[in-house]
């Protein structure tokens, strides 16, 4: 994921401020402890002058709309996956490619080094959005309501929810699946209805 922020210099110098930090996952999910820890540390290190309200469950905006909302100034901060950032900044697809990283340690080494620094600068220059941190929330798992997936052959024709990201859509087509671009927040309903 990408922990992103869009704050104007004016608001950052305005004294006591409250900002909203949104994410699309449920309370208690992988994003939530990160967001709550950030809120705690922001208040601590600002001596209480900065309050961060964590808004889970896409209360502010769906994750695939969060980046644009930050650019428009309607959302202060968001935790966004690379899949949902890349439509707004295509270079992000380099990090969305499957198997581009050997493991978490390799990903952090690349993203927290010169490559990540260069990417963050290019993103800021092009969009006005700052990345505060890169993170990892888990491996990509496959869940479906049809059958167990034990081999690539089991993917053939299987409807699979993917983000609205062309790299992911193309990847799952190559796996033999029938990818359906769908926001994460809509996935539980889609699984229940079989869509």
Which residues are covered by each model-predicted region?
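Short, polar/charged alpha-helical segment
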Residues: 28-53, 167-170
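Contiguous mixed-secondary-structure segments that line small-molecule binding/active-site clefts
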Residues: 39-43, 71, 76, 81-180
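Immediate post-signal peptide segment of exported/extracytoplasmic ligand-binding proteins
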Residues: 9-23, 40-51, 125, 148-159, ...
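Bacterial N-terminal signal peptides
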Residues: 1-6
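Extracytoplasmic small-molecule ligand-binding "clamshell" domains
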Residues: 37, 44-45, 51-71, 76, ...
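Short helix-initiation/N-cap motifs at beta->coil->alpha
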Residues: 55-68, 164-167, 180-193
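Extracytoplasmic "Venus flytrap"
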Residues: 20-36, 57-62
């Amino acid at each position: 994921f990408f922990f992103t922020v869009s704050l104007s210099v004016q608001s950052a110098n305005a004294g006591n401020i409250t900002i909203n930090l949104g994410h699309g996952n449920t309370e208690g999910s992988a994003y939530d402890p990160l967001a709550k820890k950030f809120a705690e540390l922001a208040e601590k290190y600002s001596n209480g002058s900065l309050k961060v309200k964590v808004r889970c469950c896409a209360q502010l905006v769906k994750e695939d709309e969060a980046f644009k909302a930050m650019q428009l100034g309607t959302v202060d901060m968001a935790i966004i996956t690379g899949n949902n950032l890349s439509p707004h900044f295509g270079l992000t697809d380099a990090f969305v490619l499957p198997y581009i990283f050997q493991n978490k340690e390799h990903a952090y080494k690349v993203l927290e080094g010169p490559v990540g620094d260069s990417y963050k600068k290019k993103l800021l220059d092009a969009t006005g959005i700052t990345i505060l941190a890169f993170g990892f929330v888990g491996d990509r798992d496959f869940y479906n309501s049809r059958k167990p997936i034990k081999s690539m052959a089991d993917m053939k024709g299987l409807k699979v929810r993917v983000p609205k990201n062309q790299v992911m859509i193309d990847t799952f087509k190559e796996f033999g699946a029938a990818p359906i671009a769908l926001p994460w927040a809509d996935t539980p309903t889609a699984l229940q209805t079989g869509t």
